[in-house]
Amino acid sequence: PILAAAAASMGASVTCAGMFDGVEKEEIDFIDWQAKERMSLFSLGKPAVTYALEFADCKYMFADCGNLGKQMQGLNGKREKIEQAIRAADIIACVNWAVMPEVKEVLQRVFQNSSASIKSRYLFLDLSDIRRKDSQSIQEYFRSIALIKNKNGIKTCLSINENEFDVLCKKLDMDAGLFEETLSALRNKLNLDEIILHAMKTAVFCSNSVFCTEEKQQIKDPVITTGAGDNFNAGICVAKLLDLPPKEQLN
């Protein structure tokens, strides 16, 4: 919902399927009224509860995600409408795969098992915390993404932070060395069109033909950093909708 709200605040028309427990968009207090008018919500169940402890040099997050699988049963009654919205979207952002693996099934139904036309130009991916995922599950997920890409011609983009980058490299037995070399190797291994890395001070774009970096603007004393990655991803998604070049996407 943070990504969806941020994209709507920048002018995008957004459909968001997530864990809202039946809450209407008018009740969500962190979204301004203009953004709410551009949002459609599908509630799939009760949200997980996350406690974030932020310090000057690090952050600890404690999430109770144990019931998410059971709560995702709410998907069944809304599957057709959600799949229709996915087919009609210019960009599809699939985030938080680590705790919502049902995303894979939904994508397979929409792209691989359907003869309906797909409007989407981009499939934007964010894995979230994959420390508990094994290498086989990760590779199976990206194989399904590669099948979607090859069948439909949709461009694929993975957004990862520095911690996720390190964990992903370890899971895939890769050396997390120089960003340029490792990101290129990772992109090839996962058969992706693009990887965007958002580290603490730098953002990096890597595709087959473009590799560029951009220094990130630093806020000296931020009130909160939880959700920063979601807001960054929202900016990337809107930039892609506007067909901005890679360096401007990072800006």
Residue positions per predicted region:
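Ribokinase/PfkB-type carbohydrate-kinase core domain
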Residues: P1, S9-T15, M19-F211, L244-P245, ...
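Short, surface-exposed loop/helix-turn segments at secondary-structure junctions
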Residues: T213-E215
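Conserved post-catalytic alpha-helical subdomain immediately downstream of the catalytic base
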Residues: E194, Q217-N251
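Hydrophobic/aromatic ligand-binding patch that stacks against planar heteroaromatic rings
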Residues: A6
